[in-house]
């Protein structure tokens, strides 16, 4: 999985960037999404607040903002067209590969790690996996959706080795 990572805060260590990359690759493998692409940007609470207003019309910062990529334009080609035109086939493959982007608030991650009594590493892993599941169609609006998403989230974190301490 290709993951573009940007640290707007200047506060994310190389180790944390590596952990984020690894846990997202691990989650992608669990969901069969190894061939996908995404972006992760680490932000401050101030930037999270701005993004939350812009994309969700919510006037506060949040821990992770997940923007699932859903192209507005449906492009359909016959399989024959793709077989005959390798450039078109490659372009469509790249078009289908991008699944979305996450904005993770470093400030919120620190606050929540302290509040929930676990490590910053666990919280960052949790936020990355939580956001990843959102951009792959999982949600928690109903009790059934919540049970499915949170169960999968905990399964991934535990299998990766980030348990609650």
UniProtKB/Swiss-Prot annotation:
Its cofactor is Zn(2+). Its EC number is 3.1.-.-. One of its GO terms (molecular function) is metalloendopeptidase activity. One of its GO terms (biological process) is rRNA processing. Zn(2+) binds at residues 130, 134, 140. One of its GO terms (cellular component) is cytoplasm. Keywords: Cytoplasm, Endonuclease, Hydrolase, Metal-binding, Nuclease, Ribosome biogenesis, rRNA processing, Zinc. PROSITE patterns: UPF0054. SUPFAM superfamilies: Metalloproteases ('zincins'), catalytic domain. It holds the Pfam family YbeY. It is found in: Cytoplasm. Binds 1 zinc ion. Single strand-specific metallo-endoribonuclease involved in late-stage 70S ribosome quality control and in maturation of the 3' terminus of the 16S rRNA. Belongs to the endoribonuclease YbeY family. This is Endoribonuclease YbeY. It comes from Streptococcus pneumoniae serotype 4 (strain ATCC BAA-334 / TIGR4). The gene is ybeY.
């Amino acid at each position: 999985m290709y993951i573009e990572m940007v640290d707007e805060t200047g506060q994310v260590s190389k180790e944390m960037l590596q952990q984020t990359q690894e846990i997202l690759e691990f989650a992608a493998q669990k969901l069969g999404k190894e061939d996908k692409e995404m972006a992760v940007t680490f932000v401050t609470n101030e930037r999270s607040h701005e993004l939350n207003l812009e994309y969700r019309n919510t006037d506060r910062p949040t821990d992770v903002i997940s923007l699932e990529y859903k192209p507005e334009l449906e492009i359909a080609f016959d399989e024959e067209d793709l077989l005959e035109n390798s450039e078109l086939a490659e372009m469509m493959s790249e078009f289908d590969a991008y699944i979305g982007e996450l904005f993770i608030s470093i400030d919120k991650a620190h606050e929540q790690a302290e509040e929930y009594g676990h490590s910053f590493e666990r919280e960052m892993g949790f936020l990355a996996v939580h956001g990843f599941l959102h951009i792959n169609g999982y949600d928690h609006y109903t009790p059934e959706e919540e049970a499915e998403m949170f169960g999968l989230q905990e399964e991934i974190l535990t299998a990766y080795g980030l348990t609650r301490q």
